[in-house]
């Protein structure tokens, strides 16, 4: 596998952050190995970063290019966990609601593409789960979606029975 030059990797992460799907797509087309590149800091993938920034268009591009939605970073966080991180914990209710709506839209995309939504099995280094992160971020629609998803998959009932 060819090593991706640092400047190209950095451009890719910049395009994800700035929500520039066309530029990212072109860069990936010229550098297919870029899809698996990780950030130098915490080893996030482009897919994780797209989830963190709630950039659904970029998430779709990355999935179409075979990004691995189950990768984890150095902290044990997966892409679903990244959906619920809010950079600014002092957001106004309107901003929180917008964050919640975008996160749910991405969760629905995952469900449509049969990407497992591991709400309380995917734990990070602190033993937090996506469901805990969504609650911590005060994202009620995301919590409701995940609980409904678990119920649909009969995972909630099995988990509760197993826990007893």
From Swiss-Prot:
**Which stretches are ANK repeats?**
42-107, 126-149
What SUPFAM superfamilies does its record include?
Answer: Ankyrin repeat
Source taxon at top rank? Bacteria
Q: What keywords are annotated for this sequence in UniProt?
A: ANK repeat, Repeat
The identity of this protein, by name, is Putative ankyrin repeat protein RBE_0585
């Amino acid at each position: 596998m060819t090593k991706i030059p640092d400047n190209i990797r950095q451009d890719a992460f910049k395009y994800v952050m700035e929500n520039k799907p066309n530029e990212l797509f072109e860069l990936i087309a010229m550098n297919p190995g870029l899809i698996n590149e990780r950030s130098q800091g915490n080893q996030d993938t482009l897919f994780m970063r797209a989830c963190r920034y709630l950039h659904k268009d970029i998430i779709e591009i990355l999935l179409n290019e075979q990004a691995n939605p189950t990768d984890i970073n150095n902290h044990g966080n997966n892409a679903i966990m990244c959906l619920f991180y809010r950079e600014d914990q002092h957001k106004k209710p309107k901003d929180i609601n917008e964050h919640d709506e975008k996160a749910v839209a991405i969760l629905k995309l995952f469900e449509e593409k049969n990407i497992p939504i591991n709400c309380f099995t995917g734990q990070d280094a602190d033993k937090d789960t996506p469901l805990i992160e969504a609650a911590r971020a005060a994202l009620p629609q995301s919590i409701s979606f995940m609980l409904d998803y678990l119920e649909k998959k009969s995972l909630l009932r099995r988990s509760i029975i197993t826990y007893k």
